[in-house]
Amino acid sequence: MLPSVVKNKIEQIWLDVIAGGVSQPTEVIEQLTYLMFAKQIDEREADIEMAELLSGEKQSHIFGESREEQALRWRNFKGMEARALHKHFVDRVFIFLINLNSNENSAFSRYLKHATFKINEPLALQKVVTGLEDL
């Protein structure tokens, strides 16, 4: 992609987060980080699945095999209708992210202990998810 196209997409994502009720720049970055992390762990899970397929050896997965855990993957919620996506992300995906690391003393766990998801507008969240997917 051309740099100006990427810049415009990033700017639109930023504006969509603001439209979702987050106005402080550090909070915009924080909320985008949560969403990008959700996308990244799904991509990592896909890499694990491919390694498992190619090697024939069982790998350690991020997500369980149950339908409920698979629903937490970016690829499985990115196309949801706005209200359903917002409810699913806030009630299930974000909680999963917060509890992902079982080591309560890690920096990751300490940081996420008091984390809150602040994009309050379902349509704004849907636009941000779509924007991140299109980058």
Segments and roles (model prediction):
Residues M1-L135:
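Non-catalytic, mostly N-terminal accessory regions of nucleic-acid modification and defense proteins
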